Amino acid sequence: MNLNEKFFQAGANEPENVQDVLVENEKIVWNGKPQKKAFVLNNVLKMLPIAIIWIAFDSFFIAMVAMNFSDLPPVAIPFLCIFFVAHLTPVWVWIYNCATASKRHKNTEYAFTDQRIVVRKGLIAADFKSIWYKDIAAVNLRYGLVDKLVKVGDIYVTSVGKATVLEDLDN
């Protein structure tokens, strides 16, 4: 395996795209991105039912606390505020996923080369994963309701010690 030595030099720029991480004589057979509509929609809908149930449940208790606010001891108020902010974590995670879906889509890229599969993902900085063909144990195709509606699917690649999902690829 020939590695590109320029990435190990001091002050070298980080790779920006899949072409920057190719080894010598490696050729891209196919590259692409997830379908944006499906990617964003899947991120929005993924935790939506849990977030709705969670916010409804907590809203009921927050409303009860608000109606009995004058009867509460002053020491309980900061505790209850911190508790509900922490207890709403699933809602905050869902909001984060919704707010960052477009940026994560922009930074997601897949490439099949003649030697491996390269996956670029990340929100702030790009993270590259390589799956060498010799290490692949299984490949599965899955699609959910949203995937069927927008005619995409997810490819699950299982390799030695890890699994990688290539999300929302066109059929």
State where each predicted segment sits:
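A membrane-cytosol interface segment of integral membrane proteins
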Residues: 2-5, 149-171
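Short amphipathic
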Residues: 27-34
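Surface loops and adjacent helix of pleckstrin homology
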Residues: 33, 122-124, 141-144, 160
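Active-site/binding-pocket entry motifs
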Residues: 35-36, 118, 162-163
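Alpha-helical transmembrane spans
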Residues: 37-106
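Short acidic, Gly/Pro-enriched loop/turn segments at secondary-structure junctions
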Residues: 124-127, 142-154
